[in-house]
Protein backbone atom coordinates (compact mmCIF):
# COMPACT_ATOMS: atom_id res chain seq x y z
CA UNK A 1 0.00 0.00 0.00
CA UNK A 2 2.93 2.38 0.54
CA UNK A 3 3.29 2.88 -3.19
CA UNK A 4 4.00 6.32 -4.65
CA UNK A 5 1.05 8.44 -5.69
CA UNK A 6 0.95 10.51 -8.89
CA UNK A 7 0.30 14.23 -8.42
CA UNK A 8 -0.99 15.94 -11.55
CA UNK A 9 -0.51 19.62 -12.39
CA UNK A 10 -2.06 21.69 -15.17
CA UNK A 11 -0.29 25.03 -15.41
CA UNK A 12 -0.60 26.67 -11.99
CA UNK A 13 -3.32 24.25 -10.86
CA UNK A 14 -2.63 21.17 -8.74
CA UNK A 15 -5.29 18.65 -9.76
CA UNK A 16 -7.08 16.51 -7.19
CA UNK A 17 -9.86 13.95 -7.14
CA UNK A 18 -12.68 13.53 -9.63
CA UNK A 19 -15.94 15.21 -8.56
CA UNK A 20 -18.09 14.14 -11.50
CA UNK A 21 -17.98 12.69 -14.98
CA UNK A 22 -20.21 12.88 -18.06
CA UNK A 23 -20.07 11.98 -21.74
CA UNK A 24 -17.98 14.97 -22.79
CA UNK A 25 -16.44 16.24 -19.59
CA UNK A 26 -14.86 15.24 -16.30
CA UNK A 27 -14.79 17.60 -13.30
CA UNK A 28 -11.90 17.52 -10.84
CA UNK A 29 -11.11 19.47 -7.71
CA UNK A 30 -7.97 21.60 -8.09
CA UNK A 31 -5.96 24.20 -6.20
CA UNK A 32 -4.50 27.40 -7.62
CA UNK A 33 -0.90 27.09 -6.36
CA UNK A 34 -0.38 30.87 -6.62
CA UNK A 35 -3.36 31.87 -4.45
CA UNK A 36 -4.28 28.67 -2.59
CA UNK A 37 -7.87 29.00 -3.85
CA UNK A 38 -9.81 25.80 -4.54
CA UNK A 39 -11.43 25.60 -7.97
CA UNK A 40 -13.35 23.07 -10.03
CA UNK A 41 -11.63 22.01 -13.25
CA UNK A 42 -13.95 20.89 -16.05
CA UNK A 43 -11.87 18.83 -18.49
CA UNK A 44 -13.04 18.32 -22.08
CA UNK A 45 -11.55 15.91 -24.59
CA UNK A 46 -10.65 17.91 -27.72
CA UNK A 47 -11.14 14.93 -30.00
CA UNK A 48 -14.72 14.38 -28.78
CA UNK A 49 -15.52 18.09 -29.05
CA UNK A 50 -14.32 18.20 -32.67
CA UNK A 51 -15.93 14.88 -33.58
CA UNK A 52 -19.36 16.15 -32.50
CA UNK A 53 -18.79 19.57 -34.14
CA UNK A 54 -19.27 21.34 -30.79
CA UNK A 55 -16.19 23.59 -30.79
CA UNK A 56 -17.83 26.79 -32.03
CA UNK A 57 -20.89 26.39 -29.80
CA UNK A 58 -18.74 25.79 -26.71
CA UNK A 59 -16.50 28.73 -27.62
CA UNK A 60 -19.52 31.07 -27.86
CA UNK A 61 -20.97 29.86 -24.57
CA UNK A 62 -17.65 30.19 -22.73
CA UNK A 63 -17.28 33.75 -24.05
CA UNK A 64 -20.77 34.55 -22.76
CA UNK A 65 -20.15 32.95 -19.37
CA UNK A 66 -16.96 34.95 -18.84
CA UNK A 67 -19.19 38.04 -18.85
CA UNK A 68 -21.50 36.58 -16.17
CA UNK A 69 -20.64 37.87 -12.71
CA UNK A 70 -23.58 37.12 -10.41
CA UNK A 71 -23.40 36.08 -6.73
CA UNK A 72 -25.72 33.11 -7.31
CA UNK A 73 -23.97 31.73 -10.41
CA UNK A 74 -20.76 29.69 -10.32
CA UNK A 75 -18.04 31.87 -11.88
CA UNK A 76 -16.04 30.84 -14.93
CA UNK A 77 -12.52 32.13 -14.26
CA UNK A 78 -10.48 31.12 -17.27
CA UNK A 79 -9.98 28.56 -20.03
CA UNK A 80 -6.79 26.62 -20.70
CA UNK A 81 -5.79 24.02 -23.26
CA UNK A 82 -3.16 21.36 -23.84
CA UNK A 83 -2.63 19.38 -27.01
CA UNK A 84 -5.50 17.01 -26.21
CA UNK A 85 -7.63 18.71 -23.52
CA UNK A 86 -9.61 21.88 -22.84
CA UNK A 87 -9.69 23.00 -19.19
CA UNK A 88 -12.47 25.27 -17.91
CA UNK A 89 -11.60 26.74 -14.50
CA UNK A 90 -14.70 27.31 -12.36
CA UNK A 91 -15.57 28.58 -8.90
CA UNK A 92 -15.73 25.76 -6.34
CA UNK A 93 -18.94 25.28 -4.32
CA UNK A 94 -17.43 24.64 -0.88
CA UNK A 95 -20.77 24.15 0.88
CA UNK A 96 -21.74 21.04 -1.06
CA UNK A 97 -25.10 20.41 -2.71
CA UNK A 98 -28.30 22.11 -1.56
CA UNK A 99 -30.20 18.82 -1.72
CA UNK A 100 -27.92 17.30 0.92
CA UNK A 101 -29.99 19.42 3.32
CA UNK A 102 -33.15 17.60 2.20
CA UNK A 103 -31.48 14.20 2.67
CA UNK A 104 -30.27 15.07 6.17
CA UNK A 105 -33.08 17.21 7.52
CA UNK A 106 -36.13 16.48 5.35
CA UNK A 107 -38.17 19.29 3.84
CA UNK A 108 -37.11 22.86 4.56
CA UNK A 109 -39.03 25.44 6.52
CA UNK A 110 -40.99 27.67 4.19
CA UNK A 111 -38.87 30.77 4.86
CA UNK A 112 -35.65 28.84 4.12
CA UNK A 113 -37.07 27.26 0.96
CA UNK A 114 -38.24 30.69 -0.20
CA UNK A 115 -34.76 32.19 0.34
CA UNK A 116 -33.09 29.53 -1.83
CA UNK A 117 -35.84 29.79 -4.45
CA UNK A 118 -35.41 33.58 -4.58
CA UNK A 119 -31.67 33.13 -5.14
CA UNK A 120 -32.35 30.52 -7.83
CA UNK A 121 -34.75 32.85 -9.67
CA UNK A 122 -32.24 35.72 -9.33
CA UNK A 123 -29.60 33.58 -11.04
CA UNK A 124 -31.90 32.24 -13.76
CA UNK A 125 -33.41 35.66 -14.52
CA UNK A 126 -29.99 37.32 -14.80
CA UNK A 127 -28.60 34.66 -17.13
CA UNK A 128 -31.74 34.67 -19.29
CA UNK A 129 -31.35 38.44 -19.69
CA UNK A 130 -27.93 37.74 -21.23
CA UNK A 131 -29.32 35.09 -23.57
CA UNK A 132 -27.88 32.25 -21.49
CA UNK A 133 -30.14 29.29 -20.62
CA UNK A 134 -29.42 26.30 -18.43
CA UNK A 135 -31.75 23.62 -19.83
CA UNK A 136 -30.65 21.02 -17.30
CA UNK A 137 -31.44 22.41 -13.83
CA UNK A 138 -31.33 19.59 -11.28
CA UNK A 139 -29.98 18.97 -7.75
CA UNK A 140 -26.41 18.36 -8.90
CA UNK A 141 -26.32 21.92 -10.29
CA UNK A 142 -27.43 23.57 -7.03
CA UNK A 143 -24.39 24.17 -4.83
CA UNK A 144 -23.80 26.27 -1.72
CA UNK A 145 -20.92 28.55 -0.86
CA UNK A 146 -19.27 28.78 2.57
CA UNK A 147 -21.92 31.30 3.71
CA UNK A 148 -24.80 29.04 2.66
CA UNK A 149 -25.77 31.04 -0.42
CA UNK A 150 -27.01 29.24 -3.52
CA UNK A 151 -24.65 28.85 -6.49
CA UNK A 152 -26.03 27.48 -9.77
CA UNK A 153 -23.42 25.55 -11.75
CA UNK A 154 -23.17 24.65 -15.45
CA UNK A 155 -25.07 27.72 -16.63
CA UNK A 156 -24.27 28.45 -20.25
CA UNK A 157 -22.38 25.20 -20.84
CA UNK A 158 -25.49 23.52 -22.22
CA UNK A 159 -23.80 22.45 -25.46
CA UNK A 160 -22.26 19.64 -23.43
CA UNK A 161 -25.69 18.07 -22.84
CA UNK A 162 -27.81 19.02 -25.81
CA UNK A 163 -28.26 18.57 -29.53
CA UNK A 164 -29.44 21.06 -32.14
CA UNK A 165 -30.97 19.30 -35.12
CA UNK A 166 -31.74 20.46 -38.63
CA UNK A 167 -34.94 22.24 -37.57
CA UNK A 168 -32.87 24.70 -35.55
CA UNK A 169 -34.78 23.89 -32.35
CA UNK A 170 -33.22 22.63 -29.17
CA UNK A 171 -33.49 18.93 -28.42
CA UNK A 172 -32.21 17.24 -25.27
CA UNK A 173 -31.72 13.59 -24.41
CA UNK A 174 -32.75 13.93 -20.78
CA UNK A 175 -31.00 11.71 -18.24
CA UNK A 176 -33.01 13.07 -15.28
CA UNK A 177 -36.60 13.44 -16.53
CA UNK A 178 -38.09 14.24 -13.10
CA UNK A 179 -37.00 17.88 -13.47
CA UNK A 180 -37.63 18.24 -17.21
CA UNK A 181 -40.52 20.26 -18.65
CA UNK A 182 -43.26 18.48 -20.68
CA UNK A 183 -42.14 20.20 -23.89
CA UNK A 184 -38.61 18.86 -23.36
CA UNK A 185 -39.88 15.28 -23.00
CA UNK A 186 -42.09 15.69 -26.09
CA UNK A 187 -38.88 16.48 -27.99
CA UNK A 188 -40.61 18.81 -30.43
CA UNK A 189 -38.24 21.69 -29.73
CA UNK A 190 -38.72 24.17 -26.90
CA UNK A 191 -37.92 27.58 -25.46
CA UNK A 192 -35.06 27.50 -22.94
CA UNK A 193 -36.56 30.17 -20.65
CA UNK A 194 -39.92 28.47 -20.02
CA UNK A 195 -38.26 25.06 -19.65
CA UNK A 196 -35.82 26.44 -17.06
CA UNK A 197 -38.70 27.93 -15.05
CA UNK A 198 -40.52 24.57 -14.96
CA UNK A 199 -37.38 22.97 -13.48
CA UNK A 200 -37.27 25.77 -10.88
CA UNK A 201 -40.86 24.88 -9.96
CA UNK A 202 -39.96 21.22 -9.44
CA UNK A 203 -37.03 22.28 -7.26
CA UNK A 204 -39.29 24.56 -5.17
CA UNK A 205 -41.74 21.68 -4.70
CA UNK A 206 -38.94 19.39 -3.45
CA UNK A 207 -37.62 22.03 -1.04
CA UNK A 208 -41.09 22.49 0.49
CA UNK A 209 -42.39 18.91 0.30
CA UNK A 210 -39.22 16.84 0.74
CA UNK A 211 -40.05 14.64 -2.26
CA UNK A 212 -40.51 14.92 -6.04
CA UNK A 213 -43.85 16.02 -7.53
CA UNK A 214 -43.47 13.59 -10.44
CA UNK A 215 -42.28 10.11 -9.50
CA UNK A 216 -42.99 6.64 -10.83
CA UNK A 217 -41.00 3.43 -11.15
CA UNK A 218 -42.20 3.07 -14.76
CA UNK A 219 -40.50 5.57 -17.07
CA UNK A 220 -43.41 5.88 -19.52
CA UNK A 221 -45.89 6.44 -16.67
CA UNK A 222 -43.55 9.10 -15.28
CA UNK A 223 -43.45 10.84 -18.69
CA UNK A 224 -47.26 10.78 -18.88
CA UNK A 225 -47.59 12.32 -15.40
CA UNK A 226 -45.18 15.13 -16.29
CA UNK A 227 -46.78 15.84 -19.67
CA UNK A 228 -50.23 15.93 -18.04
CA UNK A 229 -49.00 17.97 -15.07
CA UNK A 230 -50.35 15.27 -12.74
CA UNK A 231 -49.15 15.78 -9.16
CA UNK A 232 -50.53 16.52 -5.69
CA UNK A 233 -49.39 19.22 -3.27
CA UNK A 234 -48.92 18.15 0.37
CA UNK A 235 -51.40 19.64 2.87
CA UNK A 236 -48.75 21.59 4.79
CA UNK A 237 -48.03 23.99 1.89
CA UNK A 238 -49.28 27.51 2.52
CA UNK A 239 -51.88 28.82 0.02
CA UNK A 240 -49.33 31.27 -1.40
CA UNK A 241 -46.69 28.60 -2.00
CA UNK A 242 -49.22 26.20 -3.51
CA UNK A 243 -50.59 28.87 -5.84
CA UNK A 244 -47.11 29.72 -7.15
CA UNK A 245 -46.19 26.07 -7.71
CA UNK A 246 -49.45 25.47 -9.62
CA UNK A 247 -48.72 28.44 -11.89
CA UNK A 248 -45.15 27.29 -12.58
CA UNK A 249 -45.97 23.61 -13.11
CA UNK A 250 -48.41 24.42 -15.91
CA UNK A 251 -47.79 21.78 -18.61
CA UNK A 252 -48.65 24.31 -21.32
CA UNK A 253 -45.56 26.51 -21.87
CA UNK A 254 -47.73 29.18 -23.53
CA UNK A 255 -49.81 29.77 -20.38
CA UNK A 256 -47.10 29.01 -17.80
CA UNK A 257 -46.17 31.89 -15.49
CA UNK A 258 -43.12 33.91 -16.57
CA UNK A 259 -40.17 35.01 -14.44
CA UNK A 260 -41.34 38.67 -14.33
CA UNK A 261 -44.67 37.37 -13.00
CA UNK A 262 -42.86 35.21 -10.42
CA UNK A 263 -40.94 38.29 -9.26
CA UNK A 264 -44.27 40.04 -8.70
CA UNK A 265 -45.87 37.15 -6.80
CA UNK A 266 -46.87 37.99 -3.20
CA UNK A 267 -45.45 34.76 -1.69
CA UNK A 268 -42.18 35.16 -3.59
CA UNK A 269 -41.71 38.82 -2.60
CA UNK A 270 -41.82 38.20 1.16
CA UNK A 271 -38.40 39.17 2.64
CA UNK A 272 -37.03 39.32 -0.91
CA UNK A 273 -33.49 40.67 -1.26
CA UNK A 274 -32.40 41.44 -4.83
CA UNK A 275 -28.86 40.34 -5.63
CA UNK A 276 -26.23 43.03 -5.07
CA UNK A 277 -23.21 42.90 -7.35
CA UNK A 278 -21.06 44.91 -9.73
CA UNK A 279 -21.41 44.29 -13.44
CA UNK A 280 -18.24 43.65 -15.38
CA UNK A 281 -17.96 46.04 -18.30
CA UNK A 282 -15.77 43.71 -20.29
CA UNK A 283 -14.00 40.42 -19.90
CA UNK A 284 -10.66 39.38 -21.32
CA UNK A 285 -11.37 36.73 -23.94
CA UNK A 286 -7.76 36.23 -25.06
CA UNK A 287 -7.55 32.85 -23.29
CA UNK A 288 -10.71 31.65 -25.06
CA UNK A 289 -9.43 32.72 -28.47
CA UNK A 290 -6.08 31.02 -27.84
CA UNK A 291 -7.76 27.77 -26.79
CA UNK A 292 -10.00 27.53 -29.83
CA UNK A 293 -7.36 28.69 -32.31
CA UNK A 294 -5.35 25.76 -30.94
CA UNK A 295 -2.17 27.79 -30.85
CA UNK A 296 0.65 25.57 -29.53
CA UNK A 297 2.47 28.53 -28.00
CA UNK A 298 -0.49 28.98 -25.63
CA UNK A 299 -0.73 25.32 -24.59
CA UNK A 300 -0.63 24.84 -20.83
CA UNK A 301 2.04 22.61 -19.31
CA UNK A 302 0.81 19.28 -17.94
CA UNK A 303 2.96 17.51 -15.35
CA UNK A 304 2.67 14.30 -13.41
CA UNK A 305 4.83 14.14 -10.31
CA UNK A 306 5.33 11.11 -8.09
CA UNK A 307 4.79 11.75 -4.40
CA UNK A 308 4.74 9.39 -1.44
CA UNK A 309 1.29 8.30 -0.29
CA UNK A 310 -0.05 10.61 2.42
CA UNK A 311 0.19 8.97 5.83
CA UNK A 312 -2.17 11.38 7.62
CA UNK A 313 -5.25 9.23 7.06
CA UNK A 314 -5.54 8.50 10.80
CA UNK A 315 -5.39 12.22 11.53
CA UNK A 316 -8.22 12.77 9.05
CA UNK A 317 -10.30 10.09 10.74
CA UNK A 318 -9.51 11.42 14.22
CA UNK A 319 -10.63 14.90 13.17
CA UNK A 320 -14.02 13.60 12.02
CA UNK A 321 -17.03 14.25 14.22
CA UNK A 322 -17.66 10.50 14.53
CA UNK A 323 -15.80 7.37 13.56
CA UNK A 324 -18.79 5.13 13.03
CA UNK A 325 -21.46 5.09 10.34
CA UNK A 326 -23.91 7.15 12.38
CA UNK A 327 -22.51 10.20 10.59
CA UNK A 328 -22.93 9.12 7.01
CA UNK A 329 -21.61 12.10 5.10
CA UNK A 330 -18.60 13.77 6.63
CA UNK A 331 -17.46 17.05 5.17
CA UNK A 332 -14.04 17.20 3.62
CA UNK A 333 -13.11 20.87 3.50
CA UNK A 334 -16.79 21.71 3.19
CA UNK A 335 -17.69 19.48 0.23
CA UNK A 336 -20.35 16.81 0.70
CA UNK A 337 -20.39 14.39 -2.22
CA UNK A 338 -18.46 11.77 -0.34
CA UNK A 339 -18.06 9.98 2.95
CA UNK A 340 -15.23 8.11 4.61
CA UNK A 341 -14.84 5.73 7.52
CA UNK A 342 -12.23 3.54 9.16
CA UNK A 343 -12.38 -0.20 8.53
CA UNK A 344 -10.62 -3.22 10.06
CA UNK A 345 -8.88 -5.88 7.97
CA UNK A 346 -6.46 -6.29 5.09
CA UNK A 347 -6.91 -4.04 2.05
CA UNK A 348 -7.56 -6.93 -0.35
CA UNK A 349 -10.26 -8.28 1.95
CA UNK A 350 -11.93 -4.88 2.09
CA UNK A 351 -11.92 -4.61 -1.71
CA UNK A 352 -13.61 -8.01 -1.86
CA UNK A 353 -16.22 -6.98 0.73
CA UNK A 354 -17.09 -3.80 -1.20
CA UNK A 355 -17.41 -5.87 -4.38
CA UNK A 356 -19.64 -8.45 -2.68
CA UNK A 357 -21.84 -5.71 -1.22
CA UNK A 358 -22.18 -3.76 -4.48
CA UNK A 359 -22.93 -6.53 -6.99
CA UNK A 360 -26.36 -7.46 -5.52
CA UNK A 361 -27.29 -3.76 -5.79
CA UNK A 362 -26.87 -3.97 -9.58
CA UNK A 363 -23.45 -2.37 -9.95
CA UNK A 364 -20.79 -3.17 -12.54
CA UNK A 365 -17.34 -3.00 -10.93
CA UNK A 366 -13.94 -2.00 -12.27
CA UNK A 367 -10.90 -2.49 -10.02
CA UNK A 368 -7.43 -1.01 -10.19
CA UNK A 369 -5.21 -1.64 -7.19
CA UNK A 370 -7.18 -0.26 -4.25
CA UNK A 371 -9.49 1.97 -6.27
CA UNK A 372 -12.88 0.84 -7.55
CA UNK A 373 -15.40 2.33 -9.96
CA UNK A 374 -19.00 1.22 -9.51
CA UNK A 375 -21.75 1.91 -12.05
CA UNK A 376 -25.30 0.63 -12.09
CA UNK A 377 -25.59 -1.59 -15.15
CA UNK A 378 -29.00 -0.38 -16.33
CA UNK A 379 -29.82 3.32 -16.10
CA UNK A 380 -33.00 3.91 -14.14
CA UNK A 381 -35.36 6.82 -14.53
CA UNK A 382 -32.78 9.09 -12.87
CA UNK A 383 -29.91 8.03 -15.15
CA UNK A 384 -26.74 6.17 -14.26
CA UNK A 385 -25.19 6.38 -10.81
CA UNK A 386 -21.41 6.14 -10.70
CA UNK A 387 -19.50 5.77 -7.46
CA UNK A 388 -15.75 5.72 -6.80
CA UNK A 389 -14.12 4.12 -3.78
CA UNK A 390 -10.52 4.24 -2.59
CA UNK A 391 -8.76 2.52 0.31
CA UNK A 392 -5.95 4.26 2.23
CA UNK A 393 -3.69 2.41 4.65
CA UNK A 394 -3.39 3.63 8.23
CA UNK A 395 -1.78 0.44 9.55
CA UNK A 396 -1.62 -3.11 8.10
CA UNK A 397 -4.93 -3.94 9.77
CA UNK A 398 -6.65 -0.53 9.68
CA UNK A 399 -7.68 1.40 6.58
CA UNK A 400 -9.70 4.43 5.63
CA UNK A 401 -12.36 3.81 2.96
CA UNK A 402 -13.54 6.80 0.96
CA UNK A 403 -16.79 6.58 -1.03
CA UNK A 404 -17.81 9.37 -3.37
CA UNK A 405 -20.34 10.05 -6.12
CA UNK A 406 -18.86 10.86 -9.54
CA UNK A 407 -22.09 10.97 -11.54
CA UNK A 408 -25.81 10.75 -10.95
CA UNK A 409 -28.60 11.75 -8.61
CA UNK A 410 -27.60 12.79 -5.08
CA UNK A 411 -30.62 11.17 -3.44
CA UNK A 412 -29.87 7.86 -5.19
CA UNK A 413 -26.25 8.07 -4.02
CA UNK A 414 -27.35 8.49 -0.41
CA UNK A 415 -29.67 5.47 -0.73
CA UNK A 416 -26.84 3.39 -2.22
CA UNK A 417 -24.45 4.40 0.54
CA UNK A 418 -26.87 3.43 3.29
CA UNK A 419 -27.23 -0.04 1.76
CA UNK A 420 -23.47 -0.37 1.31
CA UNK A 421 -22.73 0.75 4.86
CA UNK A 422 -25.16 -1.80 6.27
CA UNK A 423 -23.34 -4.56 4.40
CA UNK A 424 -19.94 -3.38 5.70
CA UNK A 425 -21.00 -2.80 9.29
CA UNK A 426 -19.01 -5.78 10.63
CA UNK A 427 -15.66 -4.33 9.45
CA UNK A 428 -16.21 -0.71 10.50
CA UNK A 429 -13.76 0.42 13.17
CA UNK A 430 -15.53 1.94 16.16
CA UNK A 431 -14.07 4.46 18.57
CA UNK A 432 -12.37 2.67 21.48
CA UNK A 433 -11.31 -0.40 19.51
CA UNK A 434 -7.65 -1.21 18.94
CA UNK A 435 -6.40 0.59 15.85
CA UNK A 436 -3.47 -1.71 15.18
CA UNK A 437 -1.09 1.25 15.31
CA UNK A 438 2.19 0.73 17.10
CA UNK A 439 2.53 2.73 20.29
Curated annotation (Swiss-Prot):
What the entry says about domains is:
The activation loop within the kinase domain is the target of phosphorylation/activation by upstream protein kinases. The PPI motif mediates the interaction with the ABI (abscisic acid-insensitive) phosphatases.
Q: What is this protein called?
A: CBL-interacting serine/threonine-protein kinase 26
Question: What SMART domains does this protein map onto?
Answer: S_TKc (SM00220)
GO process terms (BP): signal transduction
Its Gene Ontology molecular function terms?
A: ATP binding; protein serine kinase activity; protein serine/threonine kinase activity
Q: What functional role does this protein have?
A: CIPK serine-threonine protein kinases interact with CBL proteins. Binding of a CBL protein to the regulatory NAF domain of CIPK protein lead to the activation of the kinase in a calcium-dependent manner. Involved in the calcium-dependent regulation of reactive oxygen species production by the NADPH oxidase RBOHF.
What does the subunit section of this Swiss-Prot or TrEMBL entry state?
Answer: Interacts with RBOHF (via N-terminus).
Amino acid sequence: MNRPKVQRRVGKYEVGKTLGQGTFAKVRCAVNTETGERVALKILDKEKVLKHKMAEQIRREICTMKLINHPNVVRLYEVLASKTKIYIVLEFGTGGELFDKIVHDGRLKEENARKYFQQLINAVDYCHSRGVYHRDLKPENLLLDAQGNLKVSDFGLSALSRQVRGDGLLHTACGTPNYAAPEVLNDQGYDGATADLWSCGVILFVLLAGYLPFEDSNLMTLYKKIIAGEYHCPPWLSPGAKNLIVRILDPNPMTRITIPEVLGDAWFKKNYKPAVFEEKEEANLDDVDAVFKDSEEHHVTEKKEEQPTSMNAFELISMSRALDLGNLFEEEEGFKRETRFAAKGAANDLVQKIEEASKPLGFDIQKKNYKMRLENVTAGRKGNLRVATEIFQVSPSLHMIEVRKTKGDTLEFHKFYKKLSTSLNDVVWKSGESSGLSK
